[in-house]
Structures are given as C-alpha cells and as structure tokens.
Amino acid sequence: MKILRKNHPLLKIINHSFIDLPTPSNISSWWNFGSLLGMCLVIQILTGLFLAMHYTSDTTTAFSSVAHICRDVNYGWLIRYLHANGASMFFICLFIHVGRGIYYGSYVLSETWNIGIILFLTTMATAFVGYVLPWGQMSFWGATVITNLLSAIPYIGSTLVEWIWGGFSVDKATLTRFFAFHFILPFIIAAFALVHLLFLHETGSNNPSGLNSDSDKIPFHPYYTTKDLLGIFLLLLVLMILALFFPDILGDPDNFTPANPLNTPAHXXPXXXXLFAYAILRSIPNKLGGVLALILSILILAAFPLLNTSKQHGLIFRPVTQVIYWXXIANLLVLTWIGGQPVEYPFTMIGQIASITYFAIXIILIPVSNTIENNIIKL
C-alpha cells in the first residue's frame, strides 16, 4: 500500500498534499479553519444538489417549491436548513481564516493570499445569488437594491443593470440566471480552492512563531488529520444545533412573505455575513462613492502584502500592532451591528466613524505601527 501511495500518479498527488506533507510542528487550532472551509464547501455542494432536484427557478413557483421541499420532501426541511445555516458557518470560518492570516502574517505568501481574496469575493457572490432564490420579500428587494448599485457606474451603469436583470426589473429572467450562477459558482470555488492549496504547498505553511520551521516539520498524517477531524466534528455539532434547534435565527422574517414588487420592506438588510460591507456602503452619501468603498472594503486585503514593512513575521512579538489589530476586529463587529440597523441618527454617524476607522487602521495605523516597532528593535 505504501509503495502504491508513493508511486501511483493520482495517489501520489493526494499523498504529497494530505499524508506525507511536511507541516510545522507548532501550528495551532487557528490553522484548522482551512479544512473546515473545505468541509463547509462539501456540505454546501451536497445539500445544494439535493435542493436543486426539487427547486424550480420560476417567479410563480419558486417560493412554493421551497415550501414544498420543507413540507413534502423526505428530510427536505433538514437539507434546506443545513444549506442555509451551512452558508453562515462557511462565512464565520472564512472570516476567522482571513483574520488568522492577517494576525500571523500569512499575506507574505502573496499568490496564496491573492487567490484567497478571489475565493472570498466568489463566495460572497455565490451567497448573494443564493439568497435571491427563495423569492421571499427580502430576497426580491435585496436583489433589487444590490444589483441597482451597478447603475452608479458612469455611462454604462443603467445598461449593465438591465443586462443583468434580463429586463427592466428583477423578474423571471433574473431568477433563472441567478439559479444558474448559484449552481456553477461553488464548482468554480472548489477549483480555486485546489489552486489555493497548490500555491500553499509550494511555499509550505506559515506557523504561529513566524520563524522558519524547515528544521522542525512533521508529517500531516496522522497528526493534523486527527486534529482536523476534531475540528470537523465540532463544526458539524454547531451546524446541527443551529439547523435543528434554531433554524431561522440567522434568517430574515420578511423572507416568509412571498416577493411582492408593490410592497417594500421597512429596510432591506443583506445576510449577516455581508453586513459590515453594507454598513460601509450606506455610510457614504454619494452612490458611486459608496459602491467604491464597498469594493475597497474587501480589496483592501490585497494591500496587506504591499503595505507590510515590518522586520518581523506576524504579530506574535509586536504588541503595538496587536492592539490595533484587536481594535480593528471590534470595529468590524460595530460595522456588522450598524449594517442591520435602520438608516437614522445615531446609527448613521456611528457607521461613518466606524467606516473611516476601518480604512484608517488598514492604510495608515498598521504601516505606522510597523515603522515604530522596527525602530524599537533597533534600540
């Protein structure tokens, strides 16, 4: 078996990626989230496949087909709630994974980092088009509001929006194409995830100390396969508790009402995962400015390798930047809270302050703290 594993053309790739892979001996549980994201993707594709067997992407039947899945299909309610809450778990793991990458300086592996940003954006796009499919009130108005943002693009904006809609409003054509996108994008994500791993294994994993670990590597199996398995069981436990006891806690009550173009909800709020970006968008009075800020709030991650001037790898021995990092996490939580609040005083002002702080931390404060710490080392 050992000879086959090392010599067979297909098994050799798996062996070098998951069995005999040299891994730093000191990576902590924060490194578990990569495998958890892989697990989330598998759960989403499998549950999504079964949902697609019973769902119809037509404005007249979409809402009732989701009700039919929950009422008449064997364990349809469970498949649907695993899919809906699995998406939330996916984003929680994604945010922790990115947060860990920033904290431990994984952005210096620039190819892996940039493909990670593409994965992040693709996942957000997939979640958005998926949120439209149940064709409830929030699905319809969320689709209308978010796609309308493209009309802020000069010259081609309005034409682009109508092209995406497939008409003059969000309608049957929009729903059908969103279903097509939602079906294909997870497979594109899976392909990018493999490229992400390919580039990671070119350089080897980072580790909490930020030091070179070439002299202290251990095989991935059995040490980290066991560790990942524990993480996966814990993830499944949380997911099952969510799906079985609190299935609708992360959803929106408006989505229990079928889509009605004549009746607008009190305030359209996106899914919990993208609220921080939505809060940044709303903080800027100008439409085009808001859209640019929304895009930059994600693309700012691509600036981390460029703005990094520190002589040290990661924040483990950098107390000044650690304080700024945790302030940024708190800032992100404030933005997430603001995104779900109505557009009125004091929420608008808090949102504007938090948005300015968000960009200031990443573009000004972290590079300044890098310089301060480099000078402290010289002393």
UniProtKB/Swiss-Prot annotation:
Q: Which InterPro entries match?
A: Cyt_b/b6_C, Cyt_b/b6_C_sf, Cyt_b/b6_N, Cytb/b6-like_sf, Cytochrome_b, Cytochrome_b_C_euk/bac, Cytochrome_b_N_euk/bac, Di-haem_cyt_TM
Q: Tell me which domain of life the UniProt entry assigns to the organism this sequence originates from.
A: Eukaryota
Recorded hits in Pfam families, A to Z, give: Cytochrom_B_C, Cytochrome_B
Q: Is the keyword Transmembrane helix assigned to this protein?
A: yes
The portions of this protein that span the membrane are 33-53, 77-98, 113-133, 178-198, 226-246, 288-308, 320-340, 347-367
A molecular function (GO) held by this record is: metal ion binding
Q: Which GO terms describe its biological process?
A: mitochondrial electron transport, ubiquinol to cytochrome c
Protein's membrane topology: Multi-pass membrane protein
Keywords for this entry? Electron transport, Heme, Iron, Membrane, Metal-binding, Mitochondrion, Mitochondrion inner membrane, Respiratory chain, Transmembrane, Transmembrane helix, Transport, Ubiquinone
**Matches recorded under SUPFAM superfamilies:** a domain/subunit of cytochrome bc1 complex (Ubiquinol-cytochrome c reductase), Transmembrane di-heme cytochromes
**Cofactors, names only:** heme b
Q: What are the binding positions for heme b b566 in this chain?
A: H97, H196
> Where do the annotations place a ubiquinone binding?
H201
Localization in the cell? Mitochondrion inner membrane
Q: Name one GO cellular component term.
A: mitochondrial inner membrane
Keyword Transmembrane helix recorded: yes
Q: What else is known?
A: Heme 1 (or BL or b562) is low-potential and absorbs at about 562 nm, and heme 2 (or BH or b566) is high-potential and absorbs at about 566 nm.
Q: Which family does it belong to?
A: Belongs to the cytochrome b family.
Q: Give the record's subunit note.
A: The cytochrome bc1 complex contains 11 subunits: 3 respiratory subunits (MT-CYB, CYC1 and UQCRFS1), 2 core proteins (UQCRC1 and UQCRC2) and 6 low-molecular weight proteins (UQCRH/QCR6, UQCRB/QCR7, UQCRQ/QCR8, UQCR10/QCR9, UQCR11/QCR10 and a cleavage product of UQCRFS1). This cytochrome bc1 complex then forms a dimer.
What is the protein's given name? Cytochrome b
Organism in which the protein naturally occurs: Akodon lutescens puer
Chain's gene name: MT-CYB
